[in-house]
Design a protein with these regions (language model features):
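RNase H-like, Mg2+-dependent phosphodiesterase core
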Residues: 1-211
């Protein structure tokens, strides 16, 4: 079972993580989760199932996402668009997604647990204690839960887009690749050109573009 807290104190901790950092197409999502330190029997049962989203099947992620939303003290997701990624660069866009996820909370955290190497630099979050650790989604329960929410919301957004934009989805194999740069996706870009929701920042080498 993952650690329920970074430090055994009374501070309110939130875990945050992103999904969709690597795709060539579509938005980047971030999740934020505040999980109870003193868990009910139901929360403890679900906690034993929560792990880094990359280690879970799609079916299990979808199930856990709904359980997390029902059982967490507070949760939120935020996103940034491909246009914002192109304008800001990935580092600042990632931090903006974190900020938007935090802004969606109705409880103000007193400590932020972050997977990776990026802190939250926007006011007022920059004044809150931050614990930034690589692979925190494999260590802290709240961060792993946040990674699940972010991944599920990212993939759900793409699948819902595919449902209403079948031609675009087929051209770039979006339903299968979820925006990542698979061979078929890259072939679609070369044949049909970039779509407005492609991250032109990520296509410079493929298409010799200037952003």
């Amino acid at each position: 079972m993952l650690q329920s807290r970074h430090t055994d104190d009374s501070l309110i901790e939130v875990g945050i993580d992103e999904a969709g950092r690597g795709p060539l197409w579509g938005p980047l999502y971030a999740g934020a989760v505040i999980w109870s330190h003193e868990m009910s029997e139901e929360q403890a049962k679900i906690s034993n199932l929560i792990k880094d989203s990359k280690k879970l099947s799609e079916k299990r992620r979808n199930y856990l996402s709904e359980q997390i939303k029902n059982l967490a003290i507070n949760w939120s997701v935020g996103s940034v668009s491909p246009a914002e990624i192109d304008e800001l660069g990935m580092t600042k866009a990632n931090q903006l997604a974190f900020t938007r996820a935090l802004e969606g909370l109705t409880i103000t955290p007193e400590r932020i647990l972050i997977d990776g190497c990026l802190s939250v630099i926007t006011h007022p979050w920059s004044f809150i204690e931050q614990v930034v650790e690589p692979e925190a989604d494999g260590k802290y329960l709240a961060v792993a839960a946040a990674s699940i929410l972010a991944k599920v919301e990212h993939d759900r957004w793409i699948l819902e887009y595919c449902d209403t934009n079948a031609n675009v989805a087929e051209r770039y194999d979006l339903r299968r690749c979820k925006g990542y740069g698979t061979k078929k996706h890259r072939e679609g870009i070369l044949e049909f050109g970039p779509h407005p929701l492609h991250r032109r920042l990520f296509l410079r080498k493929l298409l010799n573009l200037t952003v």
